[in-house]
Amino acid sequence: MSAAPHISVLLDEVVEALDAKPGDVVVDGTFGAGGYTRAVLPTGASVVAFDRDPTVRQFAANLPADRFRLVQARFSEMLDELGPESVEGVMLDLGVSSMQLDQAERGFSFMRDGPLDMRMGDTGPTAADLVNTLDHAELAKILYVYGEEHASRRIASFILRRREERPFERTLDLAEVIERAVGGRKGAKVHPATRSFQGLRIAVNDELGELEAGLAAAERVLKPGGRLVVVTFHSLEDRIVKAFLAERAGKAPGGSRHAPPVAAGAAPSFQLISNKAIAPSEAELAVNPRARSSKLRAAVRTDAPVWEAAG
């Protein structure tokens, strides 16, 4: 398999925010090519990494067996694997990796022809399953809510009309239909299929549901004083992380529509490290333009009990 090397975003900032010490246990919830894990191991900490993608095991081959373990599972399953108050750090790097984008056979890219898959793991329905079976309303909702695509109804109409002739099987086939639906704007920096592909990818992998479950799991596995560090890549992810941390830090009056309601008067279970998200430097963007939309948010676990759902 050939792919451009994956560059971990905000790497120095993640390591600084984690502040891992020798003997600590840190969760890398999104192992990928192992960039964050490799940056944390020199601190003397141990890393338990999670990834639903079985192909990433190749990147774990040379890591120290006494301080590293890779679990093929979603990061939302970390509580089942590790138990409560068991780690000093949790880091999550959300979204699809450049490694996956660059592999045409994974079906994430509208620039490279491949099977219309988009699964981060090897189970569950594919993007082709969705575009070939969902009705107009369901498909338009995915494109609008998850892709933030304002032409969602028109795109859905074009997709349904075309699939009457033959089912969608390839990424470029779908991208071309979307481009016909919305038209390519001359000089546009963003490909017309960008938002639609994002929406389908999020739906295929239940990324937002996984994020909410993962944040709740991190709250439970962190010891008091442990640190949660999350890197997001689009506004849907960042809003969920921001709302979760603000609520758990007692800074969100009225609660969050992104998280389950919690009992009133709960003591803050997190303390924010910074009230503002950290963005990549100009120097990093010059080396890795894909980092441009990334944001880092971090918080420290207090000794307060885990917030429980109300009712």
UniProtKB/Swiss-Prot annotation:
Report what the protein is called: Ribosomal RNA small subunit methyltransferase H
**Per the similarity annotation, which family is this?**
Belongs to the methyltransferase superfamily. RsmH family.
Provenance organism: Caulobacter vibrioides (strain NA1000 / CB15N)
The organism's taxonomy opens as: Bacteria, Pseudomonadati, Pseudomonadota, Alphaproteobacteria, Caulobacterales
The answer to whether the entry has keyword Cell division is no
- Where found in the cell? Cytoplasm
Query: Which catalytic reaction applies to this protein?
Result: cytidine(1402) in 16S rRNA + S-adenosyl-L-methionine = N(4)-methylcytidine(1402) in 16S rRNA + S-adenosyl-L-homocysteine + H(+)
- List its EC numbers: 2.1.1.199
Please list the residues that bind S-adenosyl-L-methionine: G34, G35, Y36, D51, F75, D93, Q100
Question: EC class of this enzyme?
Answer: transferase
In the UniProt record, what gene is named as encoding this protein?
rsmH
List the HAMAP family.
16SrRNA_methyltr_H (MF_01007)
Q: Which GO terms describe its cellular component?
A: cytoplasm
Q: Which SUPFAM superfamilies match?
A: Putative methyltransferase TM0872, insert domain (SSF81799), S-adenosyl-L-methionine-dependent methyltransferases (SSF53335)
Its main localization is cytoplasm
